[in-house]
Regions:
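Conserved acyl-donor/pantetheine-binding loop and adjacent beta-alpha core of acyl/acetyltransferases
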Residues: 40-87
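C-terminal "cap" of GNAT-fold acetyltransferases
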Residues: 124-126, 130-137, 141-161
């Protein structure tokens, strides 16, 4: 093995160790305003990711009336209150480190503890560098989400616990 290849391998190992050490030292903070809950991940006081969600009290009227008829909507979501996961982001340097999964897990657990068991989101690559719609769909399926409607550029997904 050449010296250059060995040096590259050592650099990759060093970087992986750095990322793993930093990822284990993540601090999560929750903030709540009148209509949105945000969970933010920090490493050494630097924001590395966040998840924003809000409760929709008349979701059919505001989100679904042009997508499903009301009977179909009521079959999918029997209760009127639905948590919409509005936005999730992870710093490019920390993608694939588990931060996004941890944000989803913490956010959903928090909302379930507060009595909400229905969730909805748009799987759309807008703002996700290097990820396609189907990559996001597969990510959200890990949390129980199912495809409700594939619109090509965007997939509506939901889960009821």
């Amino acid at each position: 093995m050449s010296k250059e290849i060995r040096e590259m391998i050592d650099k990759v190992k060093s970087f992986n160790q750095f990322v793993n050490e930093n990822v284990s030292n993540i601090t999560y903070k929750k903030s709540v305003d009148e209509d949105r809950t945000t969970i933010t991940a920090f490493i050494n006081n630097k924001k590395v990711g966040s998840l924003s969600m809000g409760v929709l009290f008349d979701a059919y009227q505001y989100e679904f009336d042009d997508v499903f008829d009301e009977d179909t909507f009521d079959e999918i979501y029997p209760d009127s209150e639905i948590v919409k996961i509005e936005h999730i982001e992870v710093d490019d340097n920390y993608k694939n480190s588990g931060i996004g999964s941890e944000l989803m897990k913490r956010g959903m657990e928090l909302m379930k503890k507060n009595g909400y068991n229905q969730f909805y989101l748009n799987a759309s690559p807008m703002g996700f560098k290097g990820l396609g719609t189907m990559d996001l769909v597969e990510f959200y399926k890990k949390f129980g989400f199912k495809e409700l409607l594939n619109q090509g550029h965007n997939v509506l997904m939901g889960v009821v616990f």
